[in-house]
Amino acid sequence: MADVERLVDLLAKVREKSRHLVLKVEGRYVAVGDLHGDLDTLERVLEEWEPPYLFLGDYVDRGDHGLEVVEQVFQLLVEGKAVALRGNHESPAMNLDGGFLDELCEKIGRKCGAVYKEFEKTFAALPLVAVVNGKIVALHGGIPLKDDMTPAALEEVEKISGDMAIPRDPLAFQILWNDPCPCEKYAPSPRGPGIWLFGAEVTKAFHERHGTRTIVRGHTYVPSGCALHHSGGVVTVFSSSAGPYKRTKPKIALVKDGVEVYDLATKNSAKCPQDIDIF
């Protein structure tokens, strides 16, 4: 059984360190895409790549070791060795059906409901965006669109307020859920209402507005473990090979002034497919 007192204390420490929706960080980071309870991949990353790490969200659900994964990620965050962004699966709406709540009850027992409430508060406090060296934007899903269908500025994201447990603010919601598409402007997403596919013109306008070069993101399952979109203006990294993702070739990325993708199995530089249709 998990040490409940220690776990609750860890979650409180994460909340203490998570005070901004948009982080600005300096240095070189190892970016890790969706893990979805893939403890083997996480441990391999920690063994073979030096910190600091930049986790792009989706630590839980679908795989068998969501609790162990999110504990390790949060411990690294508290120790100052990692940035941990929020994914769309860091949400009660997803954890109910995705498996994390059931996993928690199996591993913690009768206190799982109270402990999950602590997770819910902690997930709600996680940052949505990290800007690395002023040039690389890291987030889970994609560029959020305003009512006039132009890309929102990060300054607007910083001002988001209200209950974030299930983000009702459309900009926060879209950061967690949007995806790039091989199109010019935008299109409704098959994922559901309020979610958008954003095209090359949106990416270009976003980078011009912020003086940035590349967005590194997770969220989208690609069997190759990575994909380039919009002439390299967006890079997708997927790291899980657990649960339904056993055929994935997991990737990570080194992020500094650019984004270099590497194969987790070989540690060689990876060639990623370009402008694929992800749906």
Say what each PLM segment does.
Residues 1-279:
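Feature recognizes metal-dependent phosphohydrolase scaffolds
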